[in-house]
Amino acid sequence: MTSWAKPGQAVYLRENLSGETVQVGAFDPSLPGTANRMKSLPEGFTKLGIPALLRCAHLDTLWVTVDEVGYLESGMEGYQQAFRTLLENKQVAAVVRKQPLAFLQELCSRKDAFVVDLDDPFGKIGCVIMASGLGRRFGSNKLLADFGGEPMICRILDATEGIFRRRVVVTRHEEIARLCREREISVVLHSLPNRNDTVRLGLQGMEEMDRCLFAPADQPLLRRETVAALALVSKGSPYCWRLSCEGVPGSPVVFPEWTFEQLKNLPEGKGGGILLKKYPERLRTVNIRDGYELQD
């Protein structure tokens, strides 16, 4: 289902499978305000909107898309009931207007609803990229090794681009620091020996964040879409979140704000994993299809 407006004229609704289209709203200059002065046309919802939703509820398909649900639909009780029937029978991806209307708030507050605010999809999430390894197994600094024509470190920089309110790379290596500065990414350059030092240093400046993702810098096959999924599901959540593939856990890991103080005071040589073991009931996973994303 798709609806759209012609400003100053009308609103239309189309059933995408059949292509049938009806008018469901008409411009009314007598309405208050300067925009969206549309009044509902109940006959359009009765002719197509309600029957189309009920047909979709019984299609041989898992997903149904509805773009969009707004104030016109909020005044149509029959359409609302048909939408509830659809939700009971299908998984629905819907665009819902951000307006203080009862039906729209009902949809977004359902226990089975996963809501993404398109104006602020990821929220106040920080990112710490841990790039302090000494490369003993590799024999040299593997983060500077060529991977697809660029230093390996660049892969995690790309995978975390454009998602986080604050992003910082914690490293012992001047060359990595230089690469990050060239890309205008914040860097903490240090000479401290332990993993807990990296975690503590990374959390500096994250006071305004409500959660923080910690990502190893040596997972070059990690995709940006996967990082974004972690950021999305963790928004507004009190849980720790990590990736998993076929029951095998992996990184990155998102830690909520209530863990920050404990992360800053980890035992010497320990990382955030100690908290995941301490609070197993507060851990959730995002399952991914391709285990290669977790490989270092």
Language-model segments: residues:
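Conserved alpha/beta core of the MobA/IspD/sugar-nucleotide pyrophosphorylase nucleotidyltransferase superfamily
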Residues: 261-296
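Residues in the short beta-alpha loop(s) of Rossmann-like NAD(P)-binding domains
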Residues: 4, 98, 150, 171-175
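Internal catalytic-core helix/loop-beta-alpha segment
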Residues: 33-69, 73-75, 203, 224, ...
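Conserved beta-loop-beta/alpha segment of the NTase-like Rossmann-fold superfamily
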Residues: 193-261
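Conserved N-terminal catalytic core of the sugar/cofactor nucleotidyltransferase
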Residues: 154-213, 225
